[in-house]
Amino acid sequence: MRLILASSSKTRKTLLYRICRNSFEILPPEIDETPLSSEDPKNLSERLSLEKALKISELNRDAVVIGSDQVAFCDGKILKKSNNLNDAFEQISWQVGKQTTFFTGLALVRNGGKEVQSGTIVSRVFYRDSNFISEKLVRDYVYKEKPLNCAGSTKLEGLGICFIKRVETEDPSALMGLPLIKLCSFLKKWNVQPFA
């Protein structure tokens, strides 16, 4: 059974490698990630995960396709992926001393979309306050890490972990963009051995 990761994310590729080694392919989907009118962050992450997997599954009906998407939500607003370093600086500064909720959607699709498993991991991340996170620290982080195209501009797999006071999650890998614990459960339901 072919296994395909529907993503262009290097971090998701690295995470999937942890449980599948080289037994998967990568095919990045092209979808519109714009939120629908009044769409909440949980539904957005679930919808985008499913759309990514379905897009790739249409042309790869013999494969199990993995789609995942992450949405950050802080103080009443969805934090879109930063397009430039200035946006990233503003996003990190916005989260100082606050709680950000990360919704990491996961979808597995096979048979061209006839069979689907999907779900969302909700993680709460508590950022350190301004006594710890200075403007200079944020600027240095943005310059060194270049956190573009990641939810909330916080690369928790890298230097972004320095901003964090505490995390509440059932799946630590979800915070990096691909919930491996849930993925292993989904694969098992379809009798797919991840590290075969």
Can you say where each PLM-predicted feature lies in the sequence?
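Cofactor-binding loop segments of dinucleotide-utilizing enzymes, especially the Rossmann-like FAD-
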Residues: 8, 29, 111
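Short loop/helix-cap segments at secondary-structure boundaries that form the rim of catalytic
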Residues: 15-18, 36, 58-59
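Anionic-ligand binding patches
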Residues: 3, 40-196
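Glycine-rich, flexible loop segments associated with nucleotide phosphate handling
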Residues: 9, 25, 136-138
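Glycine-centered loop/turn motif at secondary-structure junctions
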Residues: 20-23, 191
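N-terminal beta1-alpha1 ligand-phosphate binding loop
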Residues: 1-21
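A short beta-strand-loop structural module common to alpha/beta enzyme folds
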Residues: 24-35
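Flexible, glycine-rich phosphate/dinucleotide-binding loops
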Residues: 12, 33-35, 115
